[in-house]
C-alpha cells in the first residue's frame, strides 16, 4: 500500500506523509475528528507522490535525530529504508481487562513480509553502517529460529551483501541438517551461510567470541565482514526504537485524542526496550515502559540496557526508565501448554496472532499481571508493541495441533445438482 491517504474499512482514516527520516511519516488507523481528518488527508495527498517514488524503498538516505534526542551521541548520519513504516496503531479488544483499561497495539509485525518485526528498525541503521564501512558481508548470531537472523539474511540480500549466520541448536541436532521450518526456510532461500553450534558450545564460548572467530576466518579469505550483535542490540541499533518513538509521537498528534500511559513490549536482547524507554522519556510521550523478558533475568537486562544508554552518552538510569519483569517461563523459545493455549485463544478472540517466543509471552505476562494486580492498570491506556515473529509458530506445529480449530468433511448428497463457476476448475 502506498504511503498516501485513504479511508479504510470501518470509517478509519489512514494517513501517511513522505518517508523522510528528518520529517517522520504519520500513520494512525484511529478515528479522527472531521476537521483533523480532512487536514491530515490533504497533507497525505500532497506527500503521496514523494512517498510513492519508485526506488525509495531500499534506498540509503541522510538521517537527523529528533530534536529531543539531538544530544545523544554517536548519532547515525544515514539509514536504509528497509521496512514499511509507519506501522499502524489500533485498539486491541482483549478480554478480561481491569476496569477502564484500554489496550492499543502497535503493529510492528506488519513492517514487512520476509523482513518483518522489530529487528527491521535496528537493521535500517546497522546495514547503513555496514555499507559505510565498506563491508561485503555481515555476520550475526542467534537461536535456530532467530527472527533477527532471518531479518538480517533478507536485509543483507536486499542490499547485495552476503550473510553468515551462527545458529544455536541442541547438541543432538548440531550435526544434522537444520531443515526448512519457519525462519530457516527464508534464510536458506535467500542463500544465507549457516554455521551451527550447540547450546553448550554457545554457553562456553559466547556470541561475541563466536562471531570474532568467523570474522577472522572471512578476513583471511579476503572478505570484508561486518558483525551485527545478537538481536541487533547495540547503541547504534538502539536508534531504531528511538526513531519509533518519533513515529508514535506523530501518530498521536494526528489522532489528537489518544495519549498512552504505558508501553508494553517483549524483551529478548535489550535494544528495543532501550530505544523505547530512552525515547519515551526524552520525547513528549512520557509513557512508562514495561518489558517482559523472555530469557535471562531482569537484572541482566537492566545492566545491558544501562550499557546501551551509557553508549549514547546519556546520564539517564535504566531503573528509572523501564520496569522489567520475568516472563521466560520454561526458558527461551520453550512454552508451557498454558502459554500456547493463550496464543491460540487470543488469535481466536481478536484475530491477532502472537508469536510464542516474544510477544506471546509478553502479552501473557501482561494479562497475568493485570489479573493479579488490577489496581495497577485500572483506567490506563496501554500501547502494546507487537514485535513480529510469526514464522516462529511453525516450529510449534506439533504442540499446537491439539489446540487448533476443528475441521470436518463436508456432508454432500449425491443428488446435489452441479452449477458451473468461473473457469474449468470450478
From Swiss-Prot:
Record InterPro entries: ACCD_DCysDesulf, D-Cys_desShydrase, TrpB-like_PALP, TrpB-like_PALP_sf
Tissue specificity comment: Present in seeds (at protein level).
pH and activity: Optimum pH is 7.5. Stable at pH 5.5-7.5.
Record note on temperature dependence: Optimum temperature is 40 degrees Celsius.
Active site: 146
Reaction(s) the record says it catalyses: D-cysteine + H2O = hydrogen sulfide + pyruvate + NH4(+) + H(+)
GO CC field: mitochondrion
Keywords: Lyase, Mitochondrion, Pyridoxal phosphate, Transit peptide
Top EC class of this enzyme: lyase
Record text on activity regulation: Inhibited by L-cysteine (L-cys).
Transit peptide segment: 1-63
Chief subcellular location: mitochondrion
EC code(s) of this entry: 4.4.1.15
Cofactor(s) annotated in UniProt: pyridoxal 5'-phosphate
One MF term in the entry's GO annotations: identical protein binding
Subcellular location(s) of the protein: Mitochondrion
Modification N6-(pyridoxal phosphate)lysine occurs at: 119
Note: The D-cysteine (D-cys) level in seeds depends on the variety, partly as a result of DCD1 activity.
General function of this protein: Catalyzes the production of hydrogen sulfide (H2S) from D-cysteine (D-cys).
Family note: Belongs to the ACC deaminase/D-cysteine desulfhydrase family.
Subunit structure and binding partners: Homodimer.
Name of the protein in question: D-cysteine desulfhydrase 1, mitochondrial
Organism this protein belongs to: Oryza sativa subsp. japonica
Amino acid at each position: 500500500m502506498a504511503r498516501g491517504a485513504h479511508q479504510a474499512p470501518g470509517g478509519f482514516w489512514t494517513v501517511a506523509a513522505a518517508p523522510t527520516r528528518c520529517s517522520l511519516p504519520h500513520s494512525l488507523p484511529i478515528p479522527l475528528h472531521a476537521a483533523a481528518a480532512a487536514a491530515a488527508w490533504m497533507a497525505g495527498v500532497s506527500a503521496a507522490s514523494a512517498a510513492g517514488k519508485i526506488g525509495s524503498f531500499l534506498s540509503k538516505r541522510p538521517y537527523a535525530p529528533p530534536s529531543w534526542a539531538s544530544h545523544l551521541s554517536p548519532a547515525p548520519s544515514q539509514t536504509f529504508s528497509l521496512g514499511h513504516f509507519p506501522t499502524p496503531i489500533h485498539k486491541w479488544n482483549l478480554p478480561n481487562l481491569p476496569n477502564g483499561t484500554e489496550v492499543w497495539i502497535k503493529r510492528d509485525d506488519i513492517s514487512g513480509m520476509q523482513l518483518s518485526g522489530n529487528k527491521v528498525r535496528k537493521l535500517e541503521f546497522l546495514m547503513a553502517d555496514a555499507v559505510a564501512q565498506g563491508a561485503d558481508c555481515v555476520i550475526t548470531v542467534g537461536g535456530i529460529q532467530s527472527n533477527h537472523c532471518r531479518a538480517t539474511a533478507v536485509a543483507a540480500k536486499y542490499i547485495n551483501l552476503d550473510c553468515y549466520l551462527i545458529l544455536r541448536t541442541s547438541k543432538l541436532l548440531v550435526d544434522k541438517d537444520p531443515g526448512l521450518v519457519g525462519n530457516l526456510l527464508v534464510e536458506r532461500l535467500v542463500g544465507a551461510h549457516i554455521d551451527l553450534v550447540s547450546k553448550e558450545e554457545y554457553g562456553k564460548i559466547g556470541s561475541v567470541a563466536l562471531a570474532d572467530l568467523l570474522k577472522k576466518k572471512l578476513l583471511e579469505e579476503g572478505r570484508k565482514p561486518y558483525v551485527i550483535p545478537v538481536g541487533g542490540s547495540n547503541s547504534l541499533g538502539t536508534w531504531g526504537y528511538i526513531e519509533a518513538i518519533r513515529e508514535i509521537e506523530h501518530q498521536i498528534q494526528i489522532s489528537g485524542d489518544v495519549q498512552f500511559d504505558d508501553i508494553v513490549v517483549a524483551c529478548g536482547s535489550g535494544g528495543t526496550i532501550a530505544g523505547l524507554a530512552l525515547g519515551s522519556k526524552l520525547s513528549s510521550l512520557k509513557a512508562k515502559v514495561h518489558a517482559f523478558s523472555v530469557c535471562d533475568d531482569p537484572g541482566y537486562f537492566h545492566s545491558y540496557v544501562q550499557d546501551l544508554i551509557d553508549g549514547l552518552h546519556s546520564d539517564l538510569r535504566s531503573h528509572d526508565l523501564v520496569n522489567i519483569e520475568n516472563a521466560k517461563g520454561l526458558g527461551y523459545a520453550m512454552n508451557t501448554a498454558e502459554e500456547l493455549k493463550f496464543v491460540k485463544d487470543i488469535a481466536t478472540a481478536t484475530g491477532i496472532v502472537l508469536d510464542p517466543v516474544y510477544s506471546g509471552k509478553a502479552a501473557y505476562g501482561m494479562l497475568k499481571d493485570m489479573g493479579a494486580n488490577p489496581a495497577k492498570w485500572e483506567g490506563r491506556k496501554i500501547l502494546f508493541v507487537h514485535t513480529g515473529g510469526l514464522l516462529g509458530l511453525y516450529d510449534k506445529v506439533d504442540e499446537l495441533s491439539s489446540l487448533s480449530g476443528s475441521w470436518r468433511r463436508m456432508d454432500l448428497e449425491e443428488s446435489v445438482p452441479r452449477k458451473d463457476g468461473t473457469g474449468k476448475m470450478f
